[in-house]
Amino acid sequence: MDSKVFDVTIIGAGPTGLFTAFYGGMREASVKIIESLPHIGGQLTALYPEKYIYDIAGFPKVHAQELIDRLEEQAKFFDPEIVLGQAIDKVERLEDETIRLTSNTGEVHLTKTIIITAGNGAFQPRRLNIGNSEAFEGKNLHYYVRDMNQYKGKRVVLLGGGDSAVDWALMLEKIAAKVTLVHRRDQFRAHEHSVNQLKESSVEILTPYAPINVEASDKIEKIQLQEVKGEKIIDVEVDDIICNYGFISSLGPIKDWGLEIEKNSIVVNSKMETNIPGVYAAGDVCTYDGKVKLIATGFGEGPTAINNAKNYIDPKARIQPKHSTAMF
């Protein structure tokens, strides 16, 4: 057991968690970060490290991994303790109001407050279940792009109609021999600007079609598509398939902490407080009236949680802090 009692323990080391840790240091709080994955960065690192992000203030565009690297550098300015590969299974409040966290490895952590920044929680991709497609996962059937260079000069088919599918189609167009995007509807759910770029690109768009089978030997060689509400069937030769049907997420053990949950999100108020005293949430994991799920939103919610956690620990502490320009 780590006998040190931290002021703030942050659950989740994605972008919101990392910035929240930095801001905790700004308020001179002792901070520990606990992440269930073996690395920091959350979904950005695990699913699309090479993908560009366009809606971060001050960055016209930035690679997901670069953003995480910069956030890590910023967070480490105040030397938070970072624990990887642990999920918190149990939360208990002791007689002195200290909170005891027990992880899935049996390790015990002590803290005065908790800020949950677990993003969408644990996640698994929605799989392509046609024919024997599962046999080719990890060969040439993929659910996210870790290294764009593996698709150089390849015939790539993407399945899906959301932001991920459209964004990857546009990015891979530059290096793949051919990119085909298949969607079961005529309308895409992606951002309007991205859809307009798609229509002006060389990406082959097949709508409304749905995959019904694959032909394969060692790898998938063809994917068979059927027109939705029609009888037309076409075969498309492929080198790689990227399925972007989204992810099934779960709060995991967090849902058993006694928190108020609404549609797989933790309910908070304007102070980012949950229904449990001393426990806060920020980023995509939380919800309130008018909530918008963006990384940029989490960057504002994290400091709000820290400032109120600081006041919870010490009621004499200011909720409104000094500006950073006056601190260094």
UniProtKB/Swiss-Prot annotation:
Its EC number is 1.18.1.2. The keyword DNA damage does not apply. Gene3D superfamilies: FAD/NAD(P)-binding domain. FAD binds at T16, E35, Q43, Y48, I88, F123, D284, T325. Keywords: FAD, Flavoprotein, NADP, Oxidoreductase. Binds 1 FAD per subunit. The keyword NADP applies. Its cofactor is FAD. GO terms for molecular function: ferredoxin-NADP+ reductase activity; flavin adenine dinucleotide binding; NADP binding. It catalyses: 2 reduced [2Fe-2S]-[ferredoxin] + NADP(+) + H(+) = 2 oxidized [2Fe-2S]-[ferredoxin] + NADPH. It comes from the Bacteria. Belongs to the ferredoxin--NADP reductase type 2 family. PANTHER family: THIOREDOXIN REDUCTASE 1-RELATED-RELATED (PTHR48105). Homodimer. This is Ferredoxin--NADP reductase 2. It comes from Oceanobacillus iheyensis (strain DSM 14371 / CIP 107618 / JCM 11309 / KCTC 3954 / HTE831).
